[in-house]
Amino acid sequence: AQASAGAPPEPAPAAAPDSAAIRVARSVTPSQVDPSLQSGFNQFNAGNVEGARRSYGEVLARDANNRDALLGMAAIAQKQSQFEQAQLTYQRLLELDPNDADAIAGLASVRPADPGQTESRLRRALQRTPDAAPVLFTLGNLYAQQRRWAEAQQAYFRAYTAAPGNADYAFNLAVGLDRMNQGKLALTYYQRALALARDGIGNFNQDAVRTRIAELGGQ
C-alpha cells in the first residue's frame, strides 16, 4: 500500500534499553535479581532518572564492574545528553569485555565517527552475535541517517524480531516500512509501538505516531 499524505516521522535516535534487570530476570529466578538493579530499571522506564541513578549507584558501590548497572548509567547519561559521560561508561564496559554488543552499539550511537568505520564495527559485532538487537538497531539508524532505507528497514526488522517487546524497535521498523511506501505494514508496527509504549517506555513522540496512524487510515 502506498503511504498517505503527510511525511513519515524520523526514526528514534536511541532505544530505551531492553536490558539491565529485565534481561537478568529472564535468565534467573526473580529472587536472584538484585533489588537495586530491578529498581533502577523500573525507575528509568518510569521516567524517574534520578531514582534510577541512585539505584544503579547502590549496585556499583557493591560491584564497580556490574555490567547491567553500568549499562543503566550509560543509558541515563545518554538520555540526559551527557554524551561524554555515556561514552566513558561504554568504553569502561568494552574494557571489561571488548565484544559486549550493547556497549559497542551504545558507543556507536554517542560518538561521532566515520560512518564507514562505524558500519564496519557494527558488522563485526554482528558476526559474533547475529541477533544482537541493540547493534542491529544502531546499524539501522546509521543506514537511516544516510537515507539507505531498504537496508535500514531490514536492520530494524531483525532488531524487532530479536526483541519484539521493545517499543522503539517497533517504531523504527514502522518508519523504515513507511519510507519504503509500505503503508499498510507500517501502520501495523506504528500501532504495535504505541501499544508497547503505554507504560511510557519509548523514545518517540506518541502524538506524532497517532497522527501518522490516522494519515495511514488507522484508528
Range-by-range predicted roles:
Residues 69, 103, 135, 169, ...:
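TPR alpha-solenoid repeat register
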Residues 72, 106, 138, 172, ...:
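Canonical tetratricopeptide repeat
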